[in-house]
Curated annotation (Swiss-Prot):
Belongs to the binding-protein-dependent transport system permease family. HisMQ subfamily. It is a multi-pass membrane protein. Residues 19-208 form the ABC transmembrane type-1 domain. Gene3D superfamilies: MetI-like. GO terms for cellular component: ATP-binding cassette (ABC) transporter complex. This is Putative glutamine transport system permease protein GlnP. Part of the binding-protein-dependent transport system for glutamine; probably responsible for the translocation of the substrate across the membrane. It is found in: Cell inner membrane. The chain crosses the membrane at residues 25-45, 57-79, 86-108, 187-207. NCBIfam families: HEQRo_perm_3TM.
Length: 218
């Protein structure tokens, strides 16, 4: 077994290097997904019916269709629809961000609705602008309440990003597939990739628990 690991050590390093690509997609998607999610959530709790309908329609589209189809449309159809040919990385980052935004919006909406409405009414009575009420009072409490759900979204993004390998991106999954074809050994490369995903998820979960404890104390 030890000799086997030494023999395949260059291949193992080749697979592990894909972790950076996987992490890059996930971080970009969770950042932009959070921004999109906040904007959509604000639309969903807005009194303007048109904004609510738009946000609900957006969410239904991205929650109601597979991520693979969304990625395929953005990558293959964008030259015909908008005249722009996205790279695999750009298409992946855009599709993951848009998809994540739909799910995050529902999480944030629930967090906003969970905040005591009396706080909003009290702030309004003090003539505080609605924008500041939402930014300084409601959203900070909502984010604190939904932080575990946001962590789960990041973990899901890390695992779901594996579909980008189908478009030729050299992420963890693609590198494991390449090594499998080169060595005629499918099991070992996939175990290495699985270990990398597992370590990433456990590391993020550990960091998230530390942050969550600090949020609870604050």
């Amino acid at each position: 077994m030890f000799e086997y690991l030494i023999k395949f050590s260059p291949k193992i390093l080749f697979i592990v290097e894909g972790t950076l690509i996987t992490l890059k997609y996930s971080v970009i998607a969770v950042i932009f997904g959070l921004v999109i999610g906040v904007l959509l959530a604000l639309c969903k709790v807005n009194k303007n019916r048109a904004l609510r309908l738009f946000a609900d329609f957006y969410t239904s589209i991205f929650r109601g269709t597979p991520l693979l189809i969304q990625l395929s449309i953005i990558y293959f159809a964008s030259p015909y629809l908008i005249g722009i040919k996205f790279t695999v990385f750009m298409a992946g980052a855009i599709s993951f961000s848009l998809n994540s935004g739909a799910y995050v919006s529902e999480v944030i909406r629930a967090g906003i609705n969970a905040v005591d409405k009396g706080q909003f009414e009290a702030a309004e009575a003090l003539a505080i602008p609605k924008f500041l009420i939402m930014k300084d009072i409601i959203l900070p409490q909502a984010i604190k309440n939904i932080f575990p759900s946001l962590t789960n979204e990041l973990i899901n993004l890390i695992k779901e990003s594996a579909i980008i390998s189908m478009f030729g991106e050299m992420d963890l999954m693609k590198r494991a597939q390449i090594v499998s074809l080169e060595t005629y050994n499918y099991f070992f490369p996939m175990i290495v990739a699985a270990c990398c995903y597992y370590i990433l998820v456990m590391l993020i979960s550990f960091i998230a628990r530390i942050i969550e404890k600090k949020l609870i104390v604050s």
